[in-house]
Amino acid sequence: MNRVTTESIASTAILVVMVFLFSWRSIEAANVSYDHRSLTIGNRRQLIISAAIHYPRSVPAMWPSLVQTAKEGGCNAIESYVFWNGHEPSPGKYYFGGRYNIVKFIKIVQQAGMHMILRIGPFVAAEWNYGGVPVWLHYVPGTVFRADNEPWKHYMESFTTYIVNLLKQEKLFAPQGGPIILSQVENEYGYYEKDYGEGGKRYAQWSASMAVSQNIGVPWMMCQQWDAPPTVISTCNGFYCDQFTPNTPDKPKIWTENWPGWFKTFGGRDPHRPAEDVAYSVARFFGKGGSVHNYYMYHGGTNFGRTSGGPFITTSYDYEAPIDEYGLPRLPKWGHLKDLHKAIMLSENLLISGEHQNFTLGHSLEADVYTDSSGTCAAFLSNLDDKNDKAVMFRNTSYHLPAWSVSILPDCKTEVFNTAKVTSKSSKVEMLPEDLKSSSGLKWEVFSEKPGIWGAADFVKNELVDHINTTKDTTDYLWYTTSITVSENEAFLKKGSSPVLFIESKGHTLHVFINKEYLGTATGNGTHVPFKLKKPVALKAGENNIDLLSMTVGLANAGSFYEWVGAGLTSVSIKGFNKGTLNLTNSKWSYKLGVEGEHLELFKPGNSGAVKWTVTTKPPKKQPLTWYKVVIEPPSGSEPVGLDMISMGKGMAWLNGEEIGRYWPRIARKNSPNDECVKECDYRGKFMPDKCLTGCGEPSQRWYHVPRSWFKSSGNELVIFEEKGGNPMKIKLSKRKVSVV
């Protein structure tokens, strides 16, 4: 028998054994219970260190490596929300393909030998469009989101039941041999419950009862729910949860969201949370009896298409997480936390079974000590002083504790880790640009829309309508158009002066066109959504067209009665006429939903849309309302790819019909003269999102993640819709190179 045949048989035999072992393991049922100390999975108490990875914020081709990188980082569980509006885009019509293949994602977690924490919600917040709730539900009569009313409860229970039954069918809950060990109903409702009165309390209790009745065989949680009933576990979200205690003494201490960074908005600066402070918060939590901890986010990913919420949340949801948006470890954060996890797990049994005592060792100094009957001992030494390093005596040995740090001593003698002493390597990140290339020479196809109504108006009203109630979020865009007649006797025509256009809007953004010429843009921001525009306008004698393109930039995703938050214009007037101010608010307005190219689906591969495209090697610059199409080759190498849009204004991008998302390299500005950006972050002291900000005067998002799996080997169709004007010749594909230093 030749060598090739022998090796083939051996390989096949090994594969059969591996498949058998995995199959045996995957069907091994494990009951999940809990007491005040921890979860018990099967017959073993376990500490859980979980990594949040939202399946629709990456692509299926990335899921295995993301899960594996989390496992290599010392995590033993993956957590995700379930995204209702992605799964039920219309009533009773479900979708589980592509990025929304939740079953495939959970099975990848299972194949990695990890646990799964599933937060079904189905309200999720998450800086996700409309908090994950389908927009259509707002228009079901009698519906108030997250409140005690029949329509909301009917659809919430219906979706929850559908998801639970799907996962039961796939045997994904732990008692069935699956990886799911915990589930969550609702999300941070405690913040808002009082705003709904007694009905809020009834709804919270109903939510818990409805969830428990699903009989999934694993515990249910409610985060930030201080009146959670005995049947569910109340849990903590925040930057620090060491002082948290569940609302009844029989429940374990669970931290559902530790924020290792923060989200970003278009026009906002870059928030940073140092690795030392993240590690400090985790060590304090486990030192104080915590047993389940989840990083929100461990990999933030990307808000592809129109999925970002806020409004104004960027397409990037990087979150400065341990795994970056592109799927690469962020060093030193990933490495430092890996070292922390290893140190914590050295004392796993003591932390969940041993006797806990707390000792004061001096001003702002304390020790949390765990022992068992055999004399085994572990200690967490904390320096709570946010300015001064300190020497501390513990069991006749001196230890040096930097300010705001925790040392872990798994044997009460040897310091194996200190949260402020970073030994992990760091990384240098570069975005290496490549010009767009085509196998047959780069040729652009260009189609420019005319401002205002195309075809027939959708409707006409003598008032300004709410943007969201009109579009129902089927598009970002809504045209408000009207016209005025200017007498040749107006003084401003004779003097050569300009009247002033005044516009007020509830948000989010507006492009103004006068007589088909782009006049300018006005916008809100992530901290103040409404805005006003005041701009001189050139009018002529006779008829003048006023075309206003209102845009949403993601819908509100949280807050009491947030579904009632509107957008769009509330008043329009022009000052400077002979008779004073011309109020156009109640004039005759014609409306059109969306832009023409959307309706024609020009973003679909090979779709000409029955419009006349101009073919050119030099596409026009600074031209608003323009569609650009170009066929390109994939960039060289295998590194992750970002689309560099620094030369463009604002719009949407697609590759081979896949939605890259909104682009807007809006400059990050200070909110007030007192706001500052920093060069270095001081980890010491309590973290808040505005504590350590960088990026003043820089684009809030320059690069837009394009997953490698979206590229074909050749002939890739890149489509850009530019709203206000840019230079497409300078668009580049940049490869993300990370070097360890």
Swiss-Prot record:
Reported tissue expression: Ubiquitous.
Compartment list: Secreted, Extracellular space, Apoplast
GO biological process annotation, one example: carbohydrate metabolic process
Keyword Secreted on entry: yes
Active site (record annotation): E188, E257
Protein name: Beta-galactosidase 10
Signal peptide (residue range): 1-29
Enzyme class: hydrolase
PROSITE patterns, per the entry: GLYCOSYL_HYDROL_F35
Sequence similarity: Belongs to the glycosyl hydrolase 35 family.
Documented EC number(s): 3.2.1.23
Keyword set, alphabetical order: Apoplast, Glycoprotein, Glycosidase, Hydrolase, Secreted, Signal
Phylogenetic classification of the source organism: Eukaryota, Viridiplantae, Streptophyta, Embryophyta, Tracheophyta
Top-rank taxon, per record: Eukaryota
Catalytic activity: Hydrolysis of terminal non-reducing beta-D-galactose residues in beta-D-galactosides
Glycosylation sites: N31, N358, N396, N469, N525, N583
Gene Ontology molecular function: any one: beta-galactosidase activity
A GO cellular-component term linked to this record: plastid
